[in-house]
């Protein structure tokens, strides 16, 4: 499916893949590492464990091996990517990959006033560009991460009203 999106990139533009399939062991390591960062970044220290887990799940999947609900990256159905322009530089998407802030939400720049702010408009347009390329190719987007797209996994299946292709 990614080749379909790549075919629609303008001449000289390329996808840069940061992450795709990952084993459960790596998913567990990332979950542990990122959980504490997310708690600090979003000031979740005073929430219950259950409330913290709910917020953390917006950014990284719990690595519990579950054949019915495996984390997207462990199925091979998820990809984290960006776009490189013909000048060899990444397009500006407003945050780094795997940043944990409100600005990482795919629609963040759709929800703020960007009039008169050329940088914010550029970021919004770059996110729209990536989003439309991937959605037109059949992917789904994880709303909390502008760089994360899925095809064939449980989240994609829920959105598409289909059965998951990858488990």
Residue ranges and their predicted role:
Residues 1-167:
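Cell-envelope/glycan interface and biosynthesis
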């Amino acid at each position: 499916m990614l080749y379909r999106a790549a075919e629609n990139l303008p001449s000289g533009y390329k996808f840069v893949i940061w992450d795709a399939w990952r084993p459960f062991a790596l998913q567990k390591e990332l979950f542990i590492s990122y959980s504490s960062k997310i708690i600090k970044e979003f000031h979740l220290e005073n929430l219950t464990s259950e409330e913290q887990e709910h917020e953390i799940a917006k950014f990284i999947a719990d690595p519990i091996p579950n054949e019915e609900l495996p984390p997207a990256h462990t199925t091979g159905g998820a990809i984290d990517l960006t776009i490189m322009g013909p000048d060899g530089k990444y397009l500006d998407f407003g945050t780094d990959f795997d940043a944990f802030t409100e600005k990482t939400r795919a629609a963040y720049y759709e929800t703020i006033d960007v009039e008169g702010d050329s940088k914010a408009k550029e970021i919004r347009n770059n996110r729209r560009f990536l989003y439309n390329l991937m959605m037109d190719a059949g992917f789904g987007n994880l709303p909390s991460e502008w760089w994360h797209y899925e095809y064939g996994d449980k989240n994609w299946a829920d959105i598409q009203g289909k059965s998951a292709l990858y488990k």
